Amino acid sequence: MSIKSKLLGAVAGTTLALGAQAALAGGHSEITVAYFLEWPMPFEYAKQMGTYDEELGVKVNWVSFESGVKMSAAMASGDVHLSVSQGVPPFVVAASAGQDLQILDVAVSYADNDNCVVRSDLEIDKDSTAELAGKKVAVPLGTAAHYGFLKQMSHFGVDVGSMEVVDMDPPDGAAAISQGAVDMFCGWGGSLRRAKEH
């Protein structure tokens, strides 16, 4: 294991422990932590080994989510006490809407993990982006992928108002583009890799 990996693991573990201590200070005998399956992180080793339960002295329930937006909703309902890898855009959207959230740490960049894909049979490339007008796009609203989509359309001069934007989690969006139900997909991880096949 490299020094960088060890350092990232220590930072992630410390951050998670600090957040858990805050939840415990609220009188919880167990805590529920939301995490995002698409971005494996160093904390997952300690999760699998039961280290957090042991060190905190309480049961830690782990719940996976497909998007940071859903993590925010679970935190708002009280079902989740702490979110790991929620994403900055979902945090900002939730906090702007009045949700009482606090950032403990920002650990990663999403630059290489999310993007948009246009169905290959449409033969739209960077020189013909005007043809995206009127097209249907699947994008998980309020996420890093949504932010990236808006920035890309702005860069290419495409009016998002001329498109049919459908709020879809990445697995659903990848399935929709593979079936021809949408013309464009924006997402991340395995769903993005699957969407690139179409």
Where are the model-predicted features located?
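Bacterial N-terminal signal peptides that target proteins for export
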Residues: 1-11
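Conserved, function-defining micro-sites of small-solute handling proteins
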Residues: 175, 179, 185-186
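Phosphate/pyrophosphate-binding betaalpha-module
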Residues: 193
